[in-house]
Amino acid sequence: MPSFIKSCFSSNDWITDDKKEICFIGRSNVGKSSLINALANAKIAKTSNTPGRTQLANFYDFDKFRLIDLPGYGYAKVSKSKHFELSKIISEYIYLRKNLVAVFQIIDISVITDLDLQMSELLSNRFNQHYIVLNKADKEAKSYFDNNFAKIAAKLKKDKENIVCVSAKNKTNIPNLKKLIGSVIL
């Protein structure tokens, strides 16, 4: 059963083994923790309606892989020193972690920001295995995604196969996300 392992402030705290890892990265309040709970089918990640609650790299065990929930990027309501700390945690993990096999960028489907686009470009240039998870599909009509999928893919400069639309709230397409993660871990 999936479970929380630990929170890490720096690379000194990371688990030292060779188990494959994926990470979730996204703006504050896009539902990364809720998505982890939906994947686990249990409440293993703390959730909050307040943006910026995840301020460490949180490690979760999912049997064949670990999932790391990184702090949200772009959250403005923190001090400059805290912003620097959060950026350092993200950068250290993204650039130094040898276990990392894929990055899943979580984006709120109703609000794709310039910062999301910039991060997508940066991650695409760094990783072959960079996927987009459009969360909060429950907030949009199904026809919105069907009618706008090609535009969204073009805007994000991603192939359609590298994008999945989900709802952590009502678990729409969670099986498809699990299948994608499984294909990456093999």
Curated annotation (Swiss-Prot):
It holds the Pfam family MMR_HSR1. Mg(2+) binds at S33, T54. Its cofactor is Mg(2+). GO terms for cellular component: cytosol. GO terms for biological process: division septum assembly. It comes from the Bacteria. SUPFAM superfamilies: P-loop containing nucleoside triphosphate hydrolases. GTP binds at residues 26-33, 52-56, 69-72, 135-138, 166-168. GO terms for molecular function: GTP binding; metal ion binding. Residues 18-186 form the EngB-type G domain. Keywords: Cell cycle, Cell division, GTP-binding, Magnesium, Metal-binding, Nucleotide-binding, Septation. Belongs to the TRAFAC class TrmE-Era-EngA-EngB-Septin-like GTPase superfamily. EngB GTPase family. Necessary for normal cell division and for the maintenance of normal septation. This is Probable GTP-binding protein EngB. The gene is engB.
